[in-house]
Amino acid sequence: LVGSEMCIRDSDKGWNYDCDVVSRFLLELGWSWLGYTSYLDMQVLNWMKDQSYIRKDRIVISGFSLGTEPMMVLGVLDKDIYAFVYNDFLCQTQERAVVMTKPDKENRRPFPNSIRHLIPGYWRYFNFPDVVASLAPRPIIFTEGGLDRDFRLVQSAYTASGKPENAEFHHYPKFADKAVRKDVEHLDEGLDSKTYFETVNVDPPSHYFKNELVIPWLRKVLK
């Protein structure tokens, strides 16, 4: 099980480690945070495949928070990966940037994410639900919801691949009841972060690794 977690590089420095500075230098060099972390994770993955005690046909990779991005990249690049754990909410990344534009107290329109999420040219071709959908029919579990609109897109890919049962979707407990969740096709512009998260069914204080969902799922898919 390869785990990709936010700021895992130099994690001995804890949350004081400034990932944004590293991201800036990587961008200046023609790289990106996503490109660098995906490259490093690929080295680990290739090493694992060389170990006699690891089943190469049952490798599962797990992404938590920012780590879901290199998880998606590894899945696209390496067809040997058996299954995926997506421990974050699923969103359309371009849409998030377009709608989270409410000016702050200094009348600036802040960018919705840190520079760590900046991937030059990415938005011209890709959206996160599209990339995840390309992983079909390999098993995947989503543990922290998002809009059912985006889950329907992923589910359609798994259905088309003949393995609809290989995609498992969970929402935050706060939004587990369908009657409580928002189910919209389009978001209004001018949202602040709090309103955006509420609209896409995200409960930030409950953002943690959902082992209570992942462990039973792993037992099922690794039989």
Give the positions of each predicted feature.
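Short, small-residue-biased leader/transition segments that mark boundaries at the very start
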Residues: 1-8
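C-terminal catalytic histidine-bearing segment of alpha/beta-hydrolase fold enzymes
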Residues: 160-223
